[in-house]
Amino acid sequence: MLSSVAAYSGAGRDLAMEPHSSVGPLQLRFSPYAFNGGTVLAIAGEDFSIVASDTRLSEGFSIHTRDSPKCYKLTDKTVIGCSGFHGDCLTLTKIIEARLKMYKHSNNKAMTTGAIAAMLSTILYSRRFFPYYVYNIIGGLDEEGKGAVYSFDPVGSYQRDSFKAGGSASAMLQPLLDNQVGFKNMQNVEHVPLSLDRAMRLVKDVFISAAERDVYTGDALKVCIVTKEGIRGETVPLRKD
């Protein structure tokens, strides 16, 4: 009996002296995933697109770094926002960047935003049995120069939207976007096209509000603005507690 117990003992531990809530050997489980928090958001306008994220990288009640933006530039017209497990975010973006270089060398041109979205869908679906723990949002300009946003689930299903939020504070941001950008559940309201200035004010306001309520969102806001002139970035401070 003691030999069977010793077989499941850890280094320097005697499980015979430790209480057990159930009968059976001690099982040690390894989880390949971790949730590192963070929030991403994208809004598409008539001739622009905005992709924004906070910069906090945390796990549980620990903050690993306060300077980890979740927006990655893919081309001069496309930006991707990734939230979830940071290790999978880095791996996935490196794979996408390698595919984009191969495409540019083969075709002598950059891949379009819609083609990048379709490619990302196949990459995610190929890992459906051991998926990347990443929620992706792509923002950019389409072939006609109009703003486009594509949202994904972890196994590759995607759709084109005008606005989308993902990550730890998405449940707070999405209803605000539905109301202020999509004019949902509103009556007798004129649907005015969204301007870049109003979209920027809205992005800043919703992230400031989210940082007040979500412990995984904060420190700073990184905004990537995609227009026909290229991509420019802005940084806005958020609360750091």
From Swiss-Prot:
Keywords tagged on the record: Acetylation, Cytoplasm, Glycoprotein, Nucleus, Phosphoprotein, Proteasome
Pfam families: Proteasome (PF00227)
Presence of keyword Phosphoprotein: yes
Gene Ontology CC annotations of this record: cytoplasm; cytosol; nucleus; proteasome core complex; proteasome core complex, beta-subunit complex
Biological process terms in GO annotation: proteolysis involved in protein catabolic process
Phosphotyrosine modifications at: 150
Residues cleaved off as propeptide: 1-28
Glycosylation sites: 58, 209
Sites of N-acetylmethionine modification: 1
Modified positions (Phosphoserine) in chain numbering: 62, 68, 162
InterPro entries: Ntn_hydrolases_N, Proteasome_bsu_CS, Proteasome_sua/b, Proteasome_suB-type
Chief location category: cytoplasm
SUPFAM superfamilies named among the record's database cross-references: N-terminal nucleophile aminohydrolases (Ntn hydrolases)
PROSITE patterns the UniProt entry points to: PROTEASOME_BETA_1, PROTEASOME_BETA_2
Entry's localization field: Cytoplasm; Nucleus
PTM annotation (N6-acetyllysine): residues: 204
Job of this protein: Non-catalytic component of the 20S core proteasome complex involved in the proteolytic degradation of most intracellular proteins. This complex plays numerous essential roles within the cell by associating with different regulatory particles. Associated with two 19S regulatory particles, forms the 26S proteasome and thus participates in the ATP-dependent degradation of ubiquitinated proteins.
Self-association state and partner proteins as the record states: The 26S proteasome consists of a 20S proteasome core and two 19S regulatory subunits. The 20S proteasome core is a barrel-shaped complex made of 28 subunits that are arranged in four stacked rings. The two outer rings are each formed by seven alpha subunits, and the two inner rings are formed by seven beta subunits. The proteolytic activity is exerted by three beta-subunits PSMB5, PSMB6 and PSMB7. Interacts with SERPINB2. Interacts with RFPL4A.
Family of this protein: Belongs to the peptidase T1B family.
Name of protein: Proteasome subunit beta type-1
Originating species: Bos taurus (Bovine)
Gene name linked to the record: PSMB1
